[in-house]
């Protein structure tokens, strides 16, 4: 945890403080990409914390949420057993379960005050030292959650910390003090200064540089690229993310843009991504390698460049699940729209929608009743629904035959008795 060791110690102390029996809410506040979730995970998995609580739950809230879905996630995490599935029954069941032990609940990425006020009643205060952790970009959310406790406002990294984090990403398995020459250190200093101390920018830039030769000339080319791309007064983080995207080989750009097809904070199975890439013909064919092996190579390179995060490994250290940071996902979607790679509809009903640029993929993130839509160039139709949403395939009755070029139909949550005749 470069730059946040002292903050972590303070938070751990607040969590395990035996002199505070009240249920307390500890908030971490800061802009996107500052490392709130990384710090929260480090605290959550700390040995002293793990042995101090009985019940644990980690729930991502995000911008688009429903209280019903959040409660279902909490119920699943704490193994509560409601008799029914209503908000009221879920709330009662969770509260009763949490009364039985000392709990630690993490609410990650809370955007609105309403999210906390709606959830407050399910976290009982039985004077046993239970805790709730909130990560948020907004100070008002932190203050309303627990006015008695000062929020932890995370700071930007200083230049020394920035260089340390950057070099850790460039040389993940090496000692930076012995493998980094003075010439490279000089280039590193020029690079990290442009990141403004933002951890996400530093790790993405470090991931980019890790793919380059370890020479002064190669690193200086990255410095010059940054100088050409950066606009005075522009968002440095977004410019660095764009620089890293533009550095990708052509085939890997398409693979990366595909992550815009998945919901925010979704834990994505690697095999699902690889099958989709394969169906689209994105994966390079190399002698002696299967399509699946090429797909895993692409995932590994995207992870090395810190454009995606590996959330779970296979037994052989391969990628099992992955995720994309919400800022990177925002950039991914923006770039994908500009290139007519995809278009997103999040309204309840897509009714005779007309794509202005005939994008090749349509992404739907919410449940819909009907799909009355035409696009002769559509290659992919994605229903990327929330954890507890379901698609009734009746919404597609008579629709799929319109999409003559359709190569991919992706539905992650499905209620179906038989397939539509168009795809039997």
Each PLM stretch: what is its role?
Residues 45-46, 111-114, 136-142, 366-369, ...:
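Short, polar loop motifs at secondary-structure junctions
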Residues 100-105, 127-133:
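Loop/turn-to-beta-strand initiation segments
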Residues 1-34, 38-47, 54, 60-62, ...:
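N-terminal flanking helix/linker immediately upstream of nucleotide/cofactor-binding cores
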Residues 25, 56-58, 132, 151-154, ...:
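Conserved beta-strand scaffold positions in the cores of enzyme catalytic domains, especially
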Residues 8, 12, 41, 67-75, ...:
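An amphipathic alpha-helix signature
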Residues 74-85, 92, 128-132, 138-253, ...:
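Non-catalytic, charged helical/coil tracts that couple and regulate nucleotide-powered enzyme cores
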Residues 67, 87-90, 184, 188, ...:
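Short amphipathic alpha-helix in the helical subdomain of ABC transporter nucleotide-binding domains
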